[in-house]
């Protein structure tokens, strides 16, 4: 036994010496390889049977870039990510170079926690490091009795390289450091099964950052994260030393992370080196330039149209071959001018036209029902509240909910017609549960006004749609007379005709949310219950939804972690605190979030950007560019 221990220690010493010499000779090669790191696409084209996704797109990702990948829902962002991860699974034109040392990390939108995996957070994050350590020890054990060491030495070197590449010698301290950055430093001994969904998502991000430090792809890692966890995700992203490619529509992350932007629209891709705020300024400049070019194009088109009309008139009076040739040439030129009208795939974006309507009943028709306002655009939230005073549509009194523990306890609040209210708080505090119970209206602690028409947007799309059926089939009960009407209606929500014949289960998360909004719009409800309505939605659709909510004359109760939507649309907030709901003004809510999470310089820059956007918007409407 003692002799075996000596042999093993001797073998480990030999391995260490061999590894040291090999590692020293390889250091130059590793530096060269580091310089080679890249993801590069050159004139890449790819199509689905019903849609062109990419038309000769090109981009490059190199060392230590933190890149945001943006674009409207359904443009093919997730497909491009999958092409990078599994290029051999796709038939495409052009070139796609994936030259990344080591494993490519991937954080999915969704993770299913193995309920039977009773391990602590620390042990879960240690798994890959422990596996490699055990493999190294096994090789050393085999060396103690092996006659030939060359193959074992190669195996040892390979495993040791993997271990060193992920900083394995310091993995325990690195785990604790990452947990601290994510504000989870007290969680290392917690069981995975006891974590909330947001906490588990952060653990997944930490895990990938530790075992795939060179390059990580994240597909909407922010979905359903509460604001504290979103801020933790921001800190993890900003502290990471490797390259990141992150699909996100989250405006908080976009405004506070990333030094490169990839923007995919209309089968084309634009690459921008700089921050998201800088990119938005560039888009505004592009919009002005496009407007000026479009004005010049229209002037030239109009001039040639008049020439064509004159030549046609002359041709009817005089039968001349010369006149005929001149007319034909001018018509051809006019067609070319029409075809080449200045377009920009990153400015001319087909945006959703979200509209929300009430049943338009007067307040006399139903006791406690929504008042019949006629001009929401000119009515402030304060005026709405005053007009609807004492028209209570919802009363919640001593509402409690518990699962394995008490979540909400004796919650009491009420809402009046026309009010727009957000429930805000950490994950796992019962927000979705109370919203669902209000919709079901079968809890004695909840009272809705008689005959109030209520619509509900769920996080779980399967609660609303039969996902195995087509989009068209799911809208047959929405009050349309023909399939053609359904197609035309859904086009206003960004759905091209071919998508209408797809099964709902094949749509992206953002498209499913758009579909729910389209269906809710047809219901003409007086009271909207919206559970995370901006999740998965692209930024353009988020803004369209905000405008629709502002114009909507009915009442809204919304669960959301999106600061911008809450701050821009709501009258006040119900903040989850100590199992109660505390009423908070929007001004106080803004101040609380700004103080804790927003950089002052960013806020000043954002304000300047808004002022510039407003000036440009007015100039575009007036046609003035001075």
Language model segments and positions:
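Intracellular alpha-helical coupling/juxtamembrane segments of multi-pass membrane proteins
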Residues: 283-311, 327-341
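Short intracellular "coupling" helices and adjacent cytoplasmic loop segments at the cytosolic face
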Residues: 312-324, 342
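Extreme N-terminal basic, low-complexity initiation segments
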Residues: 3-6
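Short, charged, amphipathic alpha-helical segments
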Residues: 153-157, 321-328
């Amino acid at each position: 036994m003692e002799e075996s221990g000596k042999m093993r220690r001797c073998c480990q010493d030999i391995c260490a010496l061999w590894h040291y010499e090999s590692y020293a000779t390889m250091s130059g090669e590793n530096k060269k390889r580091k310089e080679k790191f890249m993801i590069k696409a050159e004139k890449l084209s790819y199509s689905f049977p019903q849609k062109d996704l990419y038309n000769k797109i090109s981009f490059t990702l190199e060392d230590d870039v933190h890149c945001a990948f943006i674009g409207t829902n359904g443009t093919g962002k997730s497909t491009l990510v999958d092409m990078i991860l599994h290029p051999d699974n796709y038939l495409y034109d052009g070139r796609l170079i994936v030259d990344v040392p080591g494993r490519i990390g991937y954080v999915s939108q969704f993770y299913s926690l193995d309920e039977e995996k009773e391990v602590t957070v620390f042990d879960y994050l240690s798994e890959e490091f422990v596996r490699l350590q055990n493999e190294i020890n096994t090789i050393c054990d085999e060396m103690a009795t092996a006659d030939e060491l060359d193959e074992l030495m190669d195996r040892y070197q390979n495993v040791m390289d993997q271990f060193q590449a992920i900083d394995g010698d310091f993995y325990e301290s690195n785990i604790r450091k990452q947990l601290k950055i994510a504000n989870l430093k007290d969680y290392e001994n917690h069981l995975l099964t006891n974590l909330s969904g947001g906490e588990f998502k952060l653990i997944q991000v930490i895990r990938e950052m530790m075992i795939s430090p060179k390059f990580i792809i994240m597909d909407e890692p922010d979905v359903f994260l509460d604001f504290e966890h979103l801020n933790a995700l921001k800190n993890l992203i900003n502290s990471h030393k490797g390259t990141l490619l992150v699909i996100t529509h989250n405006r908080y992350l976009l405004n506070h992370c990333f030094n490169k932007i990839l923007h995919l629209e209309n089968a084309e891709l634009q690459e921008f080196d700089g921050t998201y705020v800088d990119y938005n300024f560039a888009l505004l400049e592009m919009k002005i330039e496009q407007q000026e070019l479009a004005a010049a194009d229209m002037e030239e088109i109009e001039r040639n149209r008049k020439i064509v009309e004159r030549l046609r008139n002359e041709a009817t009076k005089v039968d001349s071959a010369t006149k005929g040739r001149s007319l034909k040439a001018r018509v051809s030129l006019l067609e070319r001018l029409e075809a080449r009208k200045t377009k920009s795939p990153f400015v001319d974006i087909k945006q959703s036209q979200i509209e929300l309507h009430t049943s338009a009943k007067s307040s006399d028709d139903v006791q406690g029902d929504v008042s019949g306002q006629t001009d929401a655009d000119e009515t402030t939230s304060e005026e709405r509240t005053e007009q609807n005073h004492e028209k209570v549509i919802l009363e919640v009194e001593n509402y409690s909910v518990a699962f394995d523990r008490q979540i909400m306890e004796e919650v009491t609040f009420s809402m009046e017609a026309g009010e727009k209210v957000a429930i805000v708080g950490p994950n796992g505090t019962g927000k979705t549960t109370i919203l669902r119970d209000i919709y079901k209206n079968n809890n004695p602690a909840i009272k809705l006004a008689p005959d109030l028409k209520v619509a509900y947007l769920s996080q779980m799309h399967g609660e609303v749609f039969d996902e195995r059926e087509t989009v068209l089939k799911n809208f047959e009960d929405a009050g349309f007379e023909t399939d053609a009407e359904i197609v035309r209606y859904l086009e206003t929500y960004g759905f091209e005709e071919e998508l209408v014949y797809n099964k709902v289960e094949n749509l992206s998360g953002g498209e499913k949310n758009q579909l729910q909004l389209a269906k809710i719009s047809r219901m003409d409800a007086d009271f909207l219950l919206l559970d995370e309505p901006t999740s998965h939605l692209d930024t353009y659709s988020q803004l369209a939804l905000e405008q629709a909510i502002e114009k909507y004359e009915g009442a809204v109760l919304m669960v959301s972690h999106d600061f911008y939507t809450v701050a821009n649309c709501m009258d006040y907030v119900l903040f989850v605190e100590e199992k109660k709901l505390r009423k908070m003004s929007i001004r106080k809510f803004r101040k609380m979030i700004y103080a804790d999470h927003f950089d002052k310089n960013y806020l000043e820059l954002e304000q300047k950007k808004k002022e510039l956007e407003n000036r440009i918007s007015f100039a575009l409407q007036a046609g003035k560019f001075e």
